[in-house]
């Protein structure tokens, strides 16, 4: 009987231990800590260049250098075009090599999914995706020009991106669940619209001139006192309307276009995040190119996870753990203050070394 009881307890304890090994975020007073192997983990990290993990040779050459630099974490791109070079056929060779080299050099890994968007553009999407622009439509400018930016309003775009992402996440879970080398995932990279503040495709226009979702209006009403000042001012400018189109609720300008586009991007990312959590529940984040140097939406990547759009992103993408700023401009202290919030832990993936 005692042996039987021990066996039953052992069966229950094993899944619990495996679960406890997964990284997670934990609130400690006013601070949020990244927990790895059940202990607070301070990331001393560096991010590889855009194509620095695109060959086995480069990975093997770079990773030992990172250890010698004193890093404990490396942020590494994972490329959709190299993961799914042929539609439906997946190659995880580079992912496996990253994990193997990280373990060999005592490093943790934060993977960056270069999927439908990288720095706004769809440059790391597979060639079969790029060539079939009818099935996988592009975003359009106001003047009617198609961009090399996949449309976030296309279900086909989402299905293709999310299928590859899901297969990749399943692979990571299968090869790394016991070791716990991979500690976070960034979904897409510096998502945002360029040239114009929003997509002007027919699908986008249809939703832009439709009513603002009532649930989002309800969120604004419930959180009126804590809204970002810019979001509050936009809503107030139209008399705090409780229903109407995007322009009727927020006004007819480029910043309303940006709010609308942020809603679309955040919903897309939320669907990706839900898939990720259902497969391998580790911390997830998105990064943002800054709205700096007096530029307007579209001059900077419009509608990304920016501080003034935090209400849109937090509501529409609740499965994202934090919005992360990429800091290449002067005014470090001011930028950090925009993102170091009670509801947004500060993590800076990219920064210019002055």
Predicted ranges, named:
Residues 18-72:
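N-terminal carbohydrate-binding accessory modules
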Residues 58-133, 262-279:
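Aromatic-lined substrate-binding rim segments of carbohydrate-active enzymes
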Residues 38, 74, 102, 168, ...:
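Conserved, mostly hydrophobic/aromatic
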Residues 45-54, 77-95, 142-163, 171, ...:
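The substrate-binding groove and active-site-proximal loops of carbohydrate-active enzymes
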Residues 52-68, 301-316, 331-335:
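Short, acidic/polar
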Residues 9-18:
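Hydrophobic h-region of N-terminal signal peptides that target proteins for export
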Residues 135-310:
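Polysaccharide-binding and catalytic clefts of secreted carbohydrate-active enzymes
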Residues 107, 269-282, 308-354:
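Catalytic-core region of carbohydrate-active enzymes that cleave or remodel glycosidic bonds
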């Amino acid at each position: 009987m005692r042996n039987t009881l021990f066996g039953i307890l052992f069966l229950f304890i094993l899944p619990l231990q495996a679960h406890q090994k997964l990284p997670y975020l934990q609130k400690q007073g006013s601070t949020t800590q990244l927990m790895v192997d059940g202990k607070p983990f301070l990331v001393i990290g560096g991010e590889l260049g855009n194509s620095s993990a695109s060959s086995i040779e480069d990975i093997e050459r770079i990773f030992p250098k990172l250890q010698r630099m004193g890093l404990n974490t490396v942020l590494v791109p994972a490329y959709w075009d190299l993961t799914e070079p042929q539609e439906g056929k997946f190659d995880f060779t580079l992912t496996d090599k990253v994990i193997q080299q990280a373990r060999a050099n005592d490093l943790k890994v934060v993977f960056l999914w270069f999927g439908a968007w990288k720095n706004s553009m769809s440059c790391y999407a597979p060639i079969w995706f790029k060539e079939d622009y009818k099935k996988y439509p592009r975003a359009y400018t106001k003047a009617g020009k198609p961009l090399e930016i996949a449309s976030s309003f296309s279900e086909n775009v989402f299905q293709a991106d999310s299928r590859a992402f899901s297969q990749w996440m399943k692979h990571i879970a299968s090869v790394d669940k016991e070791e716990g080398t991979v500690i976070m995932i960034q979904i897409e990279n510096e998502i945002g619209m360029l040239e114009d503040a929003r997509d002007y495709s027919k699908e986008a226009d249809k939703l832009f001139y439709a009513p603002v979702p009532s649930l989002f209006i309800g969120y604004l009403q419930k959180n009126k006192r804590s809204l970002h000042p810019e979001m509050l001012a936009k809503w107030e400018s139209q008399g705090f309307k409780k229903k109407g189109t995007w322009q009727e609720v927020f006004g007819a300008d480029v910043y309303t276009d940006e709010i609308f586009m942020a809603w679309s991007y955040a919903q897309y990312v939320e669907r990706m995040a839900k898939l990720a959590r259902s497969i391998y529940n580790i911390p997830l984040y998105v990064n943002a190119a800054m709205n700096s140097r007096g530029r307007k939406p579209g001059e900077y990547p419009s509608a990304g996870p920016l501080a003034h759009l935090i209400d849109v992103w937090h509501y529409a993408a609740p499965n994202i753990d934090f919005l992360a700023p990429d800091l290449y401009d002067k005014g470090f202290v001011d930028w950090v203050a925009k993102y170091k919030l009670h509801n947004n832990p500060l993590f800076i993936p990219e920064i210019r070394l002055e």
